[in-house]
Structure formats: structure tokens, C-alpha cells
Amino acid sequence: MPGFDRISELPESLITQILLCLPTKDSVKTSVLSTRWKNLWLNVPGLDLTCSDFPFEDEEYEQVFINFIDRFLEFNPESRLQTFEVDYKRREIRGFKDRIGTAINRGIRLLDAVSSTMYWEEECIMYPYLEFMPLNLFTSKTLVTLKLRDSALNDPGLLSMPCLKFMILREVRWSGTMSLEKLVSGCPVLEDLTLVRTLICHIDDDELPVTRVRSRSLKTFYVPLAYGVGCRSRVPDKVLEIDAPGLENMTLKEDHFDGIVVKNLTSLFMIELNIKFAVDYRRSFDPEDLSKRNEIGDFLTGISRARHMIISQKTVKALESYSKVGSIPKFNNLSHLKAVFPSPLLPFLPAFLESFPNLKNLILKIAFAKDDETEELNLINVPRCIVSTLECVEIKGLFEWEEEEMKIARYFLENAAVLKKLTMSFIDYPRYASNSDVYEDLDKLTKRSQQCRIIVDDE
């Protein structure tokens, strides 16, 4: 029947679970639908609120914000909450820590709090401020997911979070004897950790010289891209130490630490690197720095059990510099590799592949630049993996079909004994050759593996 309201016939418990998927500002809007819907949003087992949901110019802004939260928490004080997500980064809101503590006592499974280290006065003057999390956070028996940004953590003494599996810490400040190592030690089932270290020093904290991640349960460790080209540290050099025998996936997409130490990564499956082993974007690896050489060598040895690897152009440059003064260890378990090679470093490719004797799948993206002064490309040495194990090669990032591109394709076709597929992927159509022309040129080349299939396509 047209206009028939079927949603209102659903049980209240199901409706509130549906509303839980919406930001609170949207679930509140349903209160005008009918008398039955008037207070349904107050029974939703979670809060998702941001300071931008309230008029910032209101003189009673902070009080309106906190009163709204109080009304929500007090409407059904005996009910259990599932989620508490609040972004309050504009101003200092007195008493907000107590509201987080109340939500924790209500049995929330997810806490997502975004604070700020700078607050605005009414005269538009900024001043530094740290919002400390309530101490009952560290003894929550129900939290499964914890997300904190720009928050501060004190040492609670007792720390036990028996259900916490997922933790995201972005620019968290550590106070006194509190540290990441201590926090992780109280999370016996932690599986997934994301860490963004603060590189800004307008507020002093008590970050230790070495940030340790020690966990037997941790399976995924992720340092995301957060600062981009402006990544540089204004605080003293710090070291990251990872000791996690159960770790399966590790991604380091940015240099947040000047030194990285890895221990006992016996279960490592996938590693993704976009680092150059120095925080400041203006600095690069110095081959004359003996301590840095040893650090990189130990790091590579520590991750050498990985089976899949993704490395960026930045990391390839660092490894090429390192290879002139040190030896890249063998990654005997590695079967899949995706690497971005700057075109001037293509001569380094055979020596680089020597470190992966059992490689089966290679995705090679070539980073061309108009101002690259590339020497004549001569790929002579043939590593073991090309002769014995390499089955699939995809070459990406191609713009043209000229002599250099032909040499790269010929290198794999003429030397790869068990190659099953070679894919040439062009960013744009070649200027002087169509895909069919490229295919014909490749098909004429000598193939060591007669079963190799050639594919030419566009990215």
C-alpha cells in the first residue's frame, strides 16, 4: 500500500540498531516522525557526535554540548551502551572526561574520542591543552575497539583490558611513566594496532626514547601516511621497537621514527614499506653512517621471513644506497613482490631480485620523470628467481613504447624459464604505438618459456 509505514512496525530493539548506524544528529531528526519516534533516538545504544553538530558561535556552546550528552546518558541510565564516538576538538569542555568515564561504565565496546592539543579562547587566542582520558578506561572489561586522537594518557597503575582487540592511536601524548609498551601489555588479546606518533612539540610530553610494541597476540601493525611531504620531526630522535612473534602484517607508510628495531617476527606474512629510515623529509640515508647501516641491515634481516612485500620508490632508493655499503639479506620465503622503481635505478633491479630466490609474482611499477637522466639501460645479470621460479610479471607505469621499455620486456621474456604471463600496462596509450603494435613487437621476441602468455593493456 502506497505510503504505508512498515519501519514503524519493527520492534524497537531493531529500530534502535538501525539508528545506531547513523550519526546522532541524524537519528535525532527521526523524533519528528510520530509520537512513537519522539524518544527512540535516546534509546539508541550508542552516541556519534561531533562539535560541529552544534553552533560554534553560541556563547553557551560548551554547556549545550555537555547537556546534550548528559540527556542522552541519563535517559536510560541502566541500559548498556555499545559505542561512544565523540569529536570535541574545538574547545576545552570541562567535565567531558567524566562523561567518557560514564560511558565506559555502561559497558561500551567501542570508544572513539577526538580531542585537540590546542583550544580557542573567545578572543580567538589559541592555547595548549591536554585532555586526559579517565582512569577507568584502563580497566574496561568490555572495550573491543579503542580509537584516540590528540588525547593524553596517565599511568593508571592497574591496567587490564581483557577484550580489547583493535586500537588506533593518533598523536597520543604520554605522561609520567605511562608508555605504549605499558598500554599494550595490559591488552592480552590485542590483534590490530595503528600508530601515528606526534611530531609536533608545542606541548611537552614524557615520550620515552624507545617506543616499544611488545605483544604475543598482535597480528597487524600499521603506521599510516599522516604528514605527507611535510613529515619531519621537531622532537629528539626516537626509536620504534617491535617485538611480536604473532605479527602477520606490518605496514610502515611513513617515517615517524628515526630508528626501527624488529625482534621475533617469526610469523610475518606481509610487509609494506614506504620509508627511508629518517623522519625528516629533507634527510636521506647516509651510507657513511655506520650505525644507520647496521640498523638497516638488522631491520631487513628481521623482516626476511615475509612472504609478500610492497615497497615504494622512496624505500627502493634507500635500499639501492644501502646495497653499495651493505648486503641485502635473502628473503627465502618471499613469493609476491610489488615495487616502485625510479627509472634511473632500473640497473639495480637484477641485484635487487637476487634477494628473492623463490619469487613467483612480480609487479614492477616504473616511475618515469621527464628530467630523469637515465644511463643506457643494460640488464645483464640474471638472478636465480628469474631462471627458476618467476611465473607472473606485470610491468606498470609505462607511457611510451621505446627502446628502454622493450629492453625491460626482453629481459624477462628471454631469461624467465617458467614464466606463464607477462603483462605490460600503460598509463596512457603509447604515443607512437597501439596496444596491438606493442603485442606484435613482444611476440617476435625470443621466449625462454614457451608457455608464456603476453598481455598488453591500459591501467
UniProtKB/Swiss-Prot annotation:
Q: Which InterPro entries match?
A: F-box-like_dom_sf, F-box_AtFBL13-like, F-box_dom, FBD, FBL13/AtMIF1-like, LRR_FXL15/At3g58940/PEG3-like
Q: Which residues form the F-box domain?
A: 4-50
PROSITE patterns, A to Z: FBOX
- Residue ranges annotated for the FBD domain, each copy included: 374-426
Q: What is this protein called?
A: FBD-associated F-box protein At5g27750
Question: What organism is the protein native to?
Answer: Arabidopsis thaliana (Mouse-ear cress)
Please name the taxonomic classification of the source: Eukaryota, Viridiplantae, Streptophyta, Embryophyta, Tracheophyta
